[in-house]
């Protein structure tokens, strides 16, 4: 009986290691070199009947305006941090504890880890896995690859994923031809692309678009996007 229990525990530990350590490492290394074909969210939305328009484009086929705009809108310290912006997390925690509208403090790296490898949700298990995958992609991918995958996996509306699909659907151009103004309109609907609209935006999105445009000027001036240039 003792031998059986020890063997069972050993097998369970091995399985746990494979699931939590080896499996994620292998997946991250694999996606360092090949485009992620689909994400869990894409599958979920497709099952919901929203369709799936996703066209991968390498970094050099996407307008340099888009990463600058996304850094301005989502993560001004993207080139500085190692996956986590602890100051932003603290501000988000204080904001949420005060009873105001829930605010996230996720970096682009964290969002990429969530988008590519995990399911939507706010459970502690998912957040823990998100942190683990964030460490892995920061270690094995580097900033350019993280941004490349991020731009290709963002949800931009019902069934619309990535820069190319969004550029074609909303503006009738390729991702390589996106202007800063168009990129700002895309960024303005994040993180609620099913709620807010790129075309005929409401007051909130219009105001946010202008704010992002101004912030992008600072990103360019201060070299905050140099790591993906």
From Swiss-Prot:
* Pathway assigned to this chain's UniProt record: Cell wall biogenesis; peptidoglycan biosynthesis
Q: What class of enzyme is it?
A: transferase
What does the record give as EC number?
Answer: 2.4.99.28
Matches recorded under InterPro entries: Glyco_trans_51, Lysozyme-like_dom_sf, PBP_transglycosylase, Pep_trsgly
Which Pfam family, just one, is annotated for this protein?
Answer: Transgly
Q: Give the family from UniProt.
A: Belongs to the glycosyltransferase 51 family.
What this protein is called in its record is Biosynthetic peptidoglycan transglycosylase
User: Which organism encodes this protein?
Assistant: Caulobacter vibrioides (strain NA1000 / CB15N) (Caulobacter crescentus)
What does the organism's lineage look like at the top? Bacteria, Pseudomonadati, Pseudomonadota, Alphaproteobacteria, Caulobacterales
Gene (UniProt): mtgA
């Amino acid at each position: 009986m003792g031998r059986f229990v020890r063997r069972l525990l050993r097998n369970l530990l091995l399985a746990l290691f494979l699931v939590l350590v080896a499996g994620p490492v292998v997946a991250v290394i694999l996606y360092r070199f090949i485009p992620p074909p689909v994400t869990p969210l894409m599958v979920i939305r497709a099952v919901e009947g929203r369709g799936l328009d996703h066209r991968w484009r390498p970094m050099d086929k996407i307008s340099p305006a888009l990463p600058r705009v996304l850094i301005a809108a989502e993560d001004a310290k993207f080139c500085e941090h190692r996956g986590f912006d602890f100051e932003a997390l603290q501000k988000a925690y204080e904001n949420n504890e005060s009873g105001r509208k829930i605010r996230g403090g996720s970096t682009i790296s964290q969002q990429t880890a969530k988008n590519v490898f995990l399911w939507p949700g706010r459970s502690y298990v998912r957040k823990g896995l998100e942190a683990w995958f964030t460490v892995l992609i920061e270690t094995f991918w580097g900033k350019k690859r993280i941004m490349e995958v991020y731009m290709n996996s963002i949800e931009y509306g019902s069934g619309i994923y990535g820069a190319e699909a969004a550029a074609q659907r909303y503006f009738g151009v390729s991702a390589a031809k996106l202007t800063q103004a168009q990129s700002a309109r895309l960024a303005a609907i994040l993180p609620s692309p099913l709620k807010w609209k790129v075309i005929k935006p409401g007051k909130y999105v219009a105001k946010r678009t202008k704010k992002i445009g101004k912030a992008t000027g600072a990103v360019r001036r201060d070299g905050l996007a140099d790591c993906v240039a």
